[in-house]
């Protein structure tokens, strides 16, 4: 996929950079693999904001993605590659030999007409899904499970992947894009290849309105608020906040470690950079 630049005939086109999607499917998604998705506006079940700066956005249909790849030893052919508004990666519609359809995350270099399979005996080929114990060291992977049978959780975003760097004592050691080395059970599944749409990191929305279409509202700085709203608020004239950066609730921000899950720390061999 290439990037598209535009002639600056309007101010918002001057900086706009988009991913070229001309090779993707131009029709509607498969109806049996979609469902409605309601907007939350960043609110929880009590109506309180738990995710700031969310709201609005274009109406979407949710595409049901197969992260588990549980259809074992049944070959499938790639029918088409599609855009998915719910994620940065592209998705692939596959048709199994028994006639069943499914959506999977599309890896880079997967093309229409390619065959994919989920099997212990599968070839080490783009789009094939295998247990980690059956994959040679040095292979690039995506959609990696953390618990057996739970479905892929690691490396699902556009352009991401992990590297299998070792196996020992029932665990595989994988290297994440963050620099973290992590242990994953050898019976967990992973899919060969890197996720599609690696140019996602190079796009430029060009105007605030495009962020609104995506469901993002304006991000107001704390120093622009009143003292009642934020610890950085208030002051005569423009101020710098007068203290080290904090959240609206007074906790240090911009770099302070907040990870609490010590239960799984034993699976982290080396922390991220």
UniProtKB/Swiss-Prot annotation:
One of the primary rRNA binding proteins. Required for association of the 30S and 50S subunits to form the 70S ribosome, for tRNA binding and peptide bond formation. It has been suggested to have peptidyltransferase activity; this is somewhat controversial. Makes several contacts with the 16S rRNA in the 70S ribosome. Pfam families: Ribosomal_L2, Ribosomal_L2_C. Gene3D superfamilies: 2.30.30.30, Nucleic acid-binding proteins, Ribosomal protein L2, domain 3. Belongs to the universal ribosomal protein uL2 family. The lineage of its organism: Bacteria, Pseudomonadati, Pseudomonadota, Alphaproteobacteria, Rickettsiales. This is Large ribosomal subunit protein uL2. GO terms for biological process: translation. SMART domains: Ribosomal_L2, Ribosomal_L2_C. Part of the 50S ribosomal subunit. Forms a bridge to the 30S subunit in the 70S ribosome. Keywords: Ribonucleoprotein, Ribosomal protein, RNA-binding, rRNA-binding. It comes from the Bacteria. The gene is rplB. GO terms for molecular function: rRNA binding; structural constituent of ribosome; transferase activity. One of its GO terms (cellular component) is large ribosomal subunit. InterPro entries: NA-bd_OB-fold, Rib_uL2_dom2, Ribosomal_uL2, Ribosomal_uL2_bac/org-type, Ribosomal_uL2_C, Ribosomal_uL2_CS, Ribosomal_uL2_dom3, Ribosomal_uL2_RNA-bd_dom.
């Amino acid at each position: 996929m290439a990037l598209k630049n535009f002639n600056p005939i309007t101010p918002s086109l001057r900086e706009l950079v988009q991913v070229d999607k001309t090779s993707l499917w131009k029709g509607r998604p498969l109806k049996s693999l979609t469902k409605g998705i309601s907007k939350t506006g960043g609110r929880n079940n009590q109506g309180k904001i738990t995710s700031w700066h969310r709201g609005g956005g274009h109406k979407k249909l949710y595409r049901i993605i197969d992260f588990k790849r549980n259809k074992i030893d049944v070959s499938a052919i790639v029918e088409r590659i599609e855009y998915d508004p719910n994620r940065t990666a592209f998705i692939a519609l596959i048709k199994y030999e028994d006639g069943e359809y499914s959506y999977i995350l599309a890896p880079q270099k997967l093309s229409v007409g390619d065959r994919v399979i989920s099997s212990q005996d599968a070839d080490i080929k783009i789009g094939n899904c295998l247990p980690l114990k059956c994959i040679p060291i040095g292979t690039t992977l995506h959609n990696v499970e953390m618990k057996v049978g739970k479905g892929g959780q690691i490396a699902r975003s556009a352009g991401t992947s992990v590297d299998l760097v070792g196996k020992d004592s029932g665990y595989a050691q994988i290297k994440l894009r963050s620099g973290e080395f992590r242990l994953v059970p050898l019976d967990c599944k992973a899919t060969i290849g890197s996720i599609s749409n690696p140019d996602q990191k190079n796009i430029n929305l060009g105007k605030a309105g495009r962020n609104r279409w995506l469901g993002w509202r304006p991000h107001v700085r704390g120093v622009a608020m009143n003292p009642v709203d934020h610890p950085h608020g208030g002051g005569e004239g423009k101020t710098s906040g007068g203290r080290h950066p904090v959240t609206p609730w007074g906790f240090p921000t911009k770099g302070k470690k907040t990870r609490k899950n010590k239960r799984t720390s034993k699976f982290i061999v080396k922390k991220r950079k």
